[in-house]
Amino acid sequence: ALPILSKGDIHRGGRSVAKVELDNGTILYYKPHSLDKNIKYQELYNYLCRKTGISCRTVQYLSHDSYGWEEKIENIPCKNESEVEHYYFRMGIHLFLGYALGATDLHGENIIAHGEYPVIIDMETYPGYLKQQSEKDGSSVEEKINKSTEIKLANSVIHTGMLPVLTWGRGNRGVLISAMGTEEKIKTPFKLPVVKDDKTSDIHIEYEPVEMQIKECIVRLNDQVINAADYTECIIRGFCRAYMVTMADKKVEVMLSGFFDGRSRVVLRHTQQYAMYLMASFHPDYMKSRECRKALLNVIHKEGESSFMKEIHDYEIDSLLEMDIPCFEIDANSRSVYDGNGGEHKEYLPCTPYESWRMHMKQMSYSDMECQCDYIRLSMEMLKASDGKKKMFPTRIKGYDTDKERKIYSQIRKIVHRI
């Protein structure tokens, strides 16, 4: 017997990840896309690990043009303090690669803590699109600084998804999400439909906050859950070592450029939002006909939307009507965005992802490395502030030389506190 369990979101006509257990107990994951990028990433990551003097774990892949097989990686604890330190050093290397490639999806569900080895299991959004400032961005000095700040954050380590950020709300009402691992359950600040009294004649739906827990990225030392904030400097050491190797070794940049030979997934709308639209359309009032469901889903359209956005929204609605979560891709050498049905929507991007990445790489420097380290420290401080007694952020950050940089950092502080 081969027990098969569908995992993850459904895209492109019902395709999804599947967990397969073989007769001998081996567990594999079937993925409905090529795993060539996973193999490239592993080669690059292994190279940086060797250059920084640390070992790495090799994941077994079998990749084909339109699908692939991947071994199951177990969440297991570290055996000693040294392994914990090595884990976060390796996380620093992963964080650098996410930063260098513009990744935005390194959240807890995509990283597994396998002893001293953090393993990334989803590479669909590699490489991402790195925003660049245009002469048209803002007419006043303040507008230009605000736009520069926005782009600086969007292209920073914060935007990778690996570091702690507040989402789904602000201040004390926000939810802290990261790939650094926490035993605490996440409670949504909004209500979701929940089935009550299942399998009885009183079955009904109530709306209430939902609790969730991301377990696979939790780091443990034996039975003790580790607070990643205590290992911030290990993360920074791994990040800086990988950064400096990249600046000194041209082979790394060549290996990075190898990711820009095809397409990668881009997130135009959060999956959670699509899931809520889909769930709402399953209400009995709208399941009477396809037209009723479409009438509800038409709320995706916005008044006064451009013809370009109308095309995007039409695809999203059609995809949801087919019970799929909409998905989009960008091509490394095109300004277009492509939907899950193969449709091309031209001139979505101001420049190609490859051109944008080249500009991003040119901006790398020791000054930028220090700036990213400041962001890491700022973000990791959130994990120390859960008791409400400690300051959320340090009061003084060094490393800014010009008046413009100080103004930009002032704006960043305002944005971070506002978030």
Predicted feature residues:
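Conserved kinase catalytic-core segment
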Residues: K72, I76-E183, L192
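Regulatory N- and C-terminal appendages and interdomain linkers associated
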Residues: A1-E43, P118-V119, P164-I419
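Conserved ATP-binding subdomain of kinase catalytic cores across diverse folds
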Residues: A1-A103, Y117, Q372
